[in-house]
Amino acid sequence: MNKIHVNIVSAEGEIFDGDAAMVFAPAQMGEVGIAPNHAPLLTGLKPGGVRVQPFVEGNEKADELFFYVSGGVLEVQPKKITILADTAMRAKDLDGAAAEEARRRAEDLLKERTSAVEVATAQAELAAAAAQLHLLEKIKKAAKTR
């Protein structure tokens, strides 16, 4: 089986560096699935979850790894994927209560209909909170199927 090297980094540092059988990422136009020997690609990322299926020799199957990115850039080469994220974290480090509170706060700001800049900021915060909550739901569903 082929493998592809994956590197996920943010301004804070490296989050993941390893080999994968498959990677899924939230590109601007929708989720993309990337396998080894994928055609070169450069695209923006929107807030959401990155799923990495680790490469394992033989017929063994490893648990998927989940990461949250707040946006950034995805570069794909046939044998390497680089994700340069604005903010990135392991999904296990996400705080569901904090994300829910951020979602509520952003919705309240949108209801106030303040300036265009404040509306854009609230929309970005709402998108980030919704993406975190969606990723947490995916992880819960994945845990139930194991």
Question: How does the language model describe each region?
Answer:
Residues 1-3:
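DNA-contacting interfaces and partner/effector-binding or oligomerization modules
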Residues 89-146:
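Acidic/glycine-rich phosphate/pyrophosphate-binding loops and surrounding catalytic core
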Residues 5-100, 105:
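Compact, glycine-rich, soluble single-domain proteins
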